[in-house]
């Protein structure tokens, strides 16, 4: 084998190892961090959804690691509130699109600004139109999503023992 072919094979091997590593890293995540962000809710402050009823971008300056994932907050007060009661503020279904979970699948693509708080729980959705539909039909859709979540989690091949208790009704 020529030196050039060995170099090509080496580069291809490293590329494949990188892809496999990326897949296994995302499969081990306990929280939806999107494709590239590595941070929960794409860096938005989970507490602000409840205190300000809007999506507010957090800061790395006010971060806290929970379930192996960094969470960002707009200020130290929000970070402290989350640290004291994280279950109160985390999005349902691991931060995956609640509308997709209803259908038995997931997309990591959620719009942090397309959210609904229903019965004191945060639901992230793919887009605003679907968020409005989800909220308008919550009595039907939330139980379906909740029933589908264990199946969807299994499809993700993610070991998330903490989500079992967090997202139980």
Language-model regions, residue ranges each:
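Charged, low-complexity intrinsically disordered segments
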Residues: 25-169
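Compositionally biased, low-complexity segments enriched in small residues
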Residues: 2-3, 20, 29
